[in-house]
Amino acid sequence: MGNSDRKPGLIKRLWKWWRTPSRLALGTLLLIGFVGGIVFWGGFNTGMEKANTEEFCISCHEMRNTVYQEYMDSVHYNNRSGVRATCPDCHVPHEFVPKMIRKLKASKELYGKIFGVIDTPQKFEAHRLTMAQNEWRRMKDNNSQECRNCHNFEYMDTTAQKSVAAKMHDQAVKDGQTCIDCHKGIAHKLPDMREVEPGF
């Protein structure tokens, strides 16, 4: 019996099977890719959902001991209707692409956490105005979209509002203003505002 009569080894047979496209090989690759994609997407979505919770937001003491305490005293936390807006409702866009962009930009906040930029109440207060202005700018740029997920000029019954509020809302619509133009500090203590243009 010569060498030519021997059956090829397992590795050679697998290599030949791999190199010779067949329906079975392509089907196997597609199945592996499909299952891998589902596993990746499921893990990615699970991670994103976990990172979009109030618990995640206050998991660092910088937030828990400062802005979260302020938020608990706000109408967004406790109100007559029982509807609560949590951190991601106001600070994370709902749409996929803007949400991903916001998550990437949040890496700067992670840098601040790691290197202790705002790890004491004094450091936090020293940076409060800059952090607030960054958030106000983001909200102004997206037309206060996170506010508008719950509040919308088009659906407001200004006749049911106090006269000063109705007047201001009507004027805001005429002037093309957005929520954050007037409602700064709605859920958190305002920073030293001497350098900031007043809302109303």
From Swiss-Prot:
Family: Belongs to the NapC/NirT/NrfH family.
Alphabetically ordered keywords of this record: Cell inner membrane, Cell membrane, Electron transport, Heme, Iron, Membrane, Metal-binding, Transmembrane, Transmembrane helix, Transport
Lineage of origin: Bacteria, Pseudomonadati, Pseudomonadota, Gammaproteobacteria, Enterobacterales
Descriptive protein name: Cytochrome c-type protein NapC
GN (gene name): napC
Role this protein plays: Mediates electron flow from quinones to the NapAB complex.
Species this protein is from: Escherichia coli (strain K12)
Residues the record lists as binding substrate: 103
Gene3D superfamilies noted in UniProt: Di-heme elbow motif domain
Binding residues for heme 2: 87, 90-91, 188
Domain of life: Bacteria
